[in-house]
Amino acid sequence: MKLTCVLIVAVLFLTACQLATAENSREEQGYSAVRSSDQIQDSDLKLTKSCTDDFEPCEAGFENCCSKSCFEFEDVYVCGVSIDYYDSR
């Protein structure tokens, strides 16, 4: 009978220790689902090819414009359809 009581107390003690340890490790980790979704969003941003919108500054000779056209306008290179395009219509 004494042995059974000692075993029950030991099992309860070990269970309490495991629960306390699990709670502490969860607080240190944070929410893993939130962390993993943030990591996925960051990796999506790195994988997505970004382009420069129309009328934003661009670098001549590089195809970084969404419209694939970088032209000089008032001493600055900008993305978009050049004014010559509108004049030829």
Curated annotation (Swiss-Prot):
The keyword Phosphoprotein does not apply. Residues 1-22 form the signal peptide. The modification Cysteine amide is found at C79. Disulfide bonds join C51-C66, C58-C70, C65-C79. It is found in: Secreted. GO terms for molecular function: ion channel inhibitor activity; toxin activity. Residues 23-49, 80-89 form a propeptide. One of its GO terms (cellular component) is extracellular region. Keywords: Amidation, Disulfide bond, Ion channel impairing toxin, Knottin, Neurotoxin, Secreted, Signal, Toxin. The keyword Disulfide bond applies. Expressed by the venom duct. Belongs to the conotoxin O1 superfamily. The presence of a 'disulfide through disulfide knot' structurally defines this protein as a knottin. The cysteine framework is VI/VII (C-C-CC-C-C). This is Conotoxin Bu5.
